[in-house]
Swiss-Prot record:
Gene: alaS
Keyword set includes Electron transport: no
Name the record gives this protein: Alanine--tRNA ligase
Localization (cell): Cytoplasm
One Pfam family named in its UniProt record: tRNA_SAD
Cofactor(s) annotated in UniProt: Zn(2+)
InterPro entries recorded: aa-tRNA-synth_II/BPL/LPL (IPR045864), Ala-tRNA-lgiase_IIc (IPR002318), Ala-tRNA-ligase_IIc_anticod-bd (IPR018162), Ala-tRNA-synth_IIc_core (IPR018165), Ala-tRNA-synth_IIc_N (IPR018164), Ala-tRNA_lgiase_arc (IPR022429), Ala-tRNA_ligase (IPR050058), Thr/Ala-tRNA-synth_IIc_edit (IPR018163)
Length: 876
């Protein structure tokens, strides 16, 4: 986008005494009513002059500022919306909500779904982790903040307002609403992009502080687009969207003029932490100057800050070091608020995706607690944050949070202990510790870079910690998205979906609209295409007296493509026949998946979310988020509850609801199985158990499932459990197989079936004892053989050599390591000979090389060579 397009030369500016100028520092265009102003108002072009000199007559709290914003825009016809969760379950391309517009991308911004109001006003809690290292450092950075917005979604048939009204509203809110002198406000022109959209924008500044951004979104991402912004191409879209973002915390800070933003938004919590830590007080005079100076250099430059402050304060370094303790107070409180929002959305800490971000915040919080000697608890800080925000935050799952934090703190403590050993090991083998070492120690062992630096300093080594270390680590875990191109292009034919009209339809007649090779598209079909974890239907088409098998079915746009084992020409009518046994089993397993998920959530807790799923004919699996092992008693409880519901015979209903009507009734749980980009959501509901947006085929009543049996539960990654189960006929087959096995054991053991399990347990126990006894006897025998064996002389040392079976090598290895001796073993392997060397000191490969003059396989403590002929003369 060109720097100057003239698209922001608005009548409002001209009619209200604004002049368009070019900033003498950065060269950007900006608008102001102050004829003497030469700079755009942004830092570092301008300083922070509001600290100690707030331009707002009244000092607002967060809740007061939020209410003032809502009142102003509700009076002007804006519908007030409730905030969305910070974890965007309605989209799959981002981990956290970074801005209010995320709530409406891509379904509303693309024009597919009507907005929930037009225009709207809201305050959206948001979390941004890219500046996590600067929290507490600059006095202005936050991971958690609320973005106030007034948005309008303009289409051809529904135009609300655009640039003129948007700027007027912002100006009137700041001047009439908050009482700010209009001459202090500047509007800086700057293009904006994010979430697949872009447009012209105005950044709004007051006394150096950016308080809002007004985006006029009218472009969408397009690889062939004519406009380029920051390396990405865009093209015009049909919608014109007003996307504004006002920083609630920044407006509150502006009204109070405190040294830092934290003191404006967390005053009572800061006092509480001060009372319960060894930080005595906050040096407000010095801190004010730290903040003022820090904004004058991007990125943050500590050396510049110290140098500048040194000109004013003779003891700048001493005061700066004391101020670092105050940083930890701000970090602790900020992170507690972000964690509160994450836990409200039932995020479980882990090593992947949003769970990783939660874990990072927890570990930084633990570190901050230790640095200031905080006597309170993180859960207490989370609750205090909630008490200040309970008007906009749903009740917290306190027991869940306590459980999760307890587990995380235990893990961190264990990792720290192991990590110390890892650091010492690295320091023994390396002369320096690089960034990759720091990332490994942090990611895998939870060791903060400053701990590594302290340990390295004791060894006389200096560790360079990147100032953006945590942001750099986070970038390795962020979800990446890219425009996907279909590998194959099909004609835009809309296939009518008969499987939705009647999921029990087994036969149909359709017209072949497209045929190429072994692929056909019909005008209508009862064959279900693969999707939502449900495999495609199989069956056949009847054509000219022949059966042509349907091997696969896929959906491409509105067309449903059938892959065949033969060819059918275009323009003919064919009869389609569904493989009903396969379809019915898939319907049972698909419906059973919904039932299982609902019961798991009911018994394990609301933190259970679907993480993955695969339905199949013989068995299915469901992956869920959960942070504790699921024991046998809980499995039985789950199965019994499912059986009760099946016996009750709960009906299964399917409804196509408008997007926001569906969300209003069922919440964002709807999107556990995926997010449809369509104006309506197909909601599959098991009465009183589960409701989910789903495109699959289902039973009319869960009684048709018959029975469900969990086969196994396994942790497939941290805090993700896979539940493999069978339902219907496959469950019956499992019971039959299990009974047959028990019957066979009963016959072999001459015991009743109800005693067969005890018999097997006792037999296994006895066999294990016999094996241990044999192993002990064999160990003693081999020890005696080693003692009596001939030795082979290699250089200055003699090494015992014995003949042994390959199955005895593990025993020999245990003996060698326990006694600290080296041993050579000769074993017969078919017609060949294997020579194994065992060396606790790590010289096994060298021993074999000296002995046989060839390279060995294995490791330095146990290696071997296989040769064609007997090479040694070993006598027992």
């Amino acid at each position: 986008m060109e720097k100057q397009t003239g698209e922001l030369d608005l009548k409002f500016f001209k009619n209200n005494g604004f002049e368009k100028k070019i900033c003498r520092v950065c060269g950007s265009y900006f608008w102001t009513t102050d004829s003497r102003r030469e700079t755009c108002g942004d830092t570092p072009c301008d300083e922070y002059t509001f600290i100690g000199n707030p331009p707002v007559p009244k000092k607002y709290t967060l809740s007061e500022m939020r209410k003032a914003f809502f009142d102003f825009f509700e009076k002007r016809g804006h519908k007030l919306l409730e905030p969305y969760p910070v974890v965007p379950r309605w989209r799959e391309d981002v981990l956290l909500v970074n801005a209010s517009i995320y709530d409406f991308q891509p379904h509303v911004t693309s024009g597919i779904v009507k907005p929930p109001g037009n225009p709207i006003v809201m305050s959206q809690p948001s979390i941004r982790m890219n500046d996590v290292d600067l929290v507490g450092v600059t006095g202005r950075h936050l991971t958690s903040f609320e973005m106030l917005c007034h948005d309008a979604f303009n289409s051809k048939n529904d135009f609300v307002y655009w640039k003129e009204e948007t700027v007027r509203y912002s100006y009137e809110f700041l001047t009439d609403g908050l009482g700010i002198d209009g001459s202090l406000i500047t509007y800086k022109e700057k293009p904006w992009s994010g979430g697949g959209n872009a447009g012209n924008a105005l950044e709004v500044f007051v006394r150096g502080l950016e308080v809002a951004t007004l985006v006029f979104m009218d472009m969408k991402e397009d690889q062939e687009g004519e406009v380029e912004i920051e390396g990405t191409r865009y093209t015009k879209m049909d919608m014109q969207i007003v996307d504004t973002g006002y920083g609630l915390e920044r407006l509150t800070w502006l009204s109070q003029g405190t040294p830092t933003v934290y003191q404006a938004i967390y005053p009572e919590i800061i006092d509480y932490v001060l009372e319960n830590s060894y930080v005595e007080s906050i040096d407000n005079e010095f801190l004010s100057d730290v903040v003022r100076v820090s904004v004058m250099r991007e990125p943050y430059d500590e050396a510049f800050v110290l140098s500048t402050l040194g000109e004013k304060y003779p003891n700048a370094l001493e005061r700066f070091e004391k101020a670092k303790k105050v940083r930890d107070i701000f970090v602790l409180i900020d992170h507690a608020r972000s964690l509160m929002h994450m836990f409200e959305a039932f995020v479980i800490p882990s090593n992947v995706k949003v769970g990783y971000l939660a874990r990072l915040l927890i570990r930084r919080s633990i570190r901050a607690q230790k640095n200031i000697g905080f006597k309170g608890s993180l859960i207490n800080l989370i609750e205090r944050n909630y008490n200040e925000l309970k008007d906009i935050v749903k009740p917290l799952p306190i027991e869940f949070i306590k459980d999760v934090l307890s587990i995380e703190m235990q893990k961190y403590s264990e990792l720290e202990k192991r990590g110390q050993q890892v650091i010492e090991k690295i320091l023994k083998t390396k002369k320096s510790i690089d960034i990759d070492d720091l990332v490994l120690l942090y990611d895998s062992h939870g060791i903060s870079p400053d701990v590594v630096a302290a340990m390295a300093a004791e060894k006389g080594l200096k560790v360079m910690i990147p100032p953006n270390f945590h942001a750099m680590v986070i970038s390795r875990h962020e979800k990446k998205s890219a425009l996907k191109k279909s590998a194959k292009v099909y004609p835009n034919i809309e296939t009518r979906t008969l499987y939705y009209d009647d999921s029990t339809m087994r036969e149909f007649t359709g017209l072949v609209m497209y045929s190429k090779g072994n692929e056909v598209i019909l005008d209508k079909t009862a064959f279900y295409p693969e999707g939502g974890g449900q495999p495609a239907d199989h069956g056949y088409f009847e054509f000219k007296g022949k059966k042509i098998n349907v091997l696969d079915v896929q959906k491409h746009g509105n067309a449903i493509v059938h892959k065949l084992d033969g060819e059918i020409p275009e323009g003919v009518r064919v009869k389609g026949v569904i493989d009903w046994e396969r379809r019915s089993r898939l319907m049972v397993h698909h419906t059973a998946t919904h039932l299982l998920l609902g019961v798991l959530r009911d018994i394990l807790g609301d933190h259970v979310w679907q993480s993955g799923v695969q339905k199949d004919v013989s068995e299915s699996h469901l992956d869920i988020t959960h942070y504790k092992r699921i024991d046998e008693d809980t499995i039985k409880k789950i199965e019994h509850r499912i059986f009760e519901l099946i016996t009750e015979g709960r009906p299964v209903s399917v409804k196509n609801l408008d997007w926001y009507m569906a969300i209003g009734k069922y919440g964002f749980r709807l999107f556990e199985g995926g997010v449809p980009l369509s104006p309506k959501v197909r909601v599959v509901e098991i009465e009183g158990v589960d409701a989910e947006g789903c495109g699959g085929t289902h039973l009319k009543n869960i009684s048709s499932i018959g029975v469900l049996k969990i086969k196994k539960i396994e942790a497939i990654q941290e805090n993700i459990y896979r539940i493999t189960f069978v339902a219907g006929v496959p469950a019956l087959e499992l019971f039959e197989d299990s009974y047959d096995l028990a019957y066979r054991v009963s016959n072999i053991s001459k015991k009743n079936i109800d005693q067969a399990g005890d018999f097997v347990e006792n037999t296994v126990r006895e066999l294990s004892k016999i094996k241990r006894d044999l192993d002990s006897a064999r160990t003693k025998l081999i020890e005696e053989e080693i003692r009596k064996s001939n030795s082979i002389k290699l250089g200055e040392k003699e090494i015992p050599a014995i003949e042994a079976e390959t199955s005895d090598i593990d025993i020999v290895s245990r003996i060698a390591h326990s006694k600290g001796i080296e041993v050579i073993i000769e074993s017969r392997v078919g017609t060949k000979f294997r020579y194994t060397a065992i060396s606790p000191s790590g010289k096994s490969k060298q021993i074999l090389h000296d002995l046989l003059h060839t390279d060995a396989e294995g490791n330095d403590k146990l290696s071997y060579v296989i040769v064609d002929h007997k090479e040694l003369s070993i006598t027992r």
